[in-house]
Amino acid sequence: MFVLVSYDVAIDDGGAKRLRRVAKACRNYGQRVQYSVFECIVDPAQWTVLRDNLIREIDEGKDSLRFYYLGSNWRRRVEHVGAKKGIDQEGPMIV
């Protein structure tokens, strides 16, 4: 399943640390497409782990998370224009 994750973490007492932890959790499951936006292709078990980790990291009184579920037919729903074209997460990858 394809999920777009966006977040806004307040930079105050402990905010910078929370921001780094949220970004790291997202990087483990997807690719950054903007500063606080990640495209993640995950199975249901991975999604549960990622979502739980993100919710645990934020301060719900100061920070916010948004999850956009684009499903398995996401290629028809995503259009990219401009620089920084992303990598195909489902295609072959040479490391």
Task: State where each predicted segment sits.
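Intrinsically disordered, low-complexity boundary segments flanking structured domains
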Residues: K24-A25, R51-R56, E79-V81
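Extended, hydrophobic alpha-helical segments
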Residues: M1-V37, I41, A45-Q46
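Short, intrinsically disordered low-complexity segments
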Residues: V33-G71
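C-terminal structural segments of small proteins and small subunits
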Residues: E57-V95
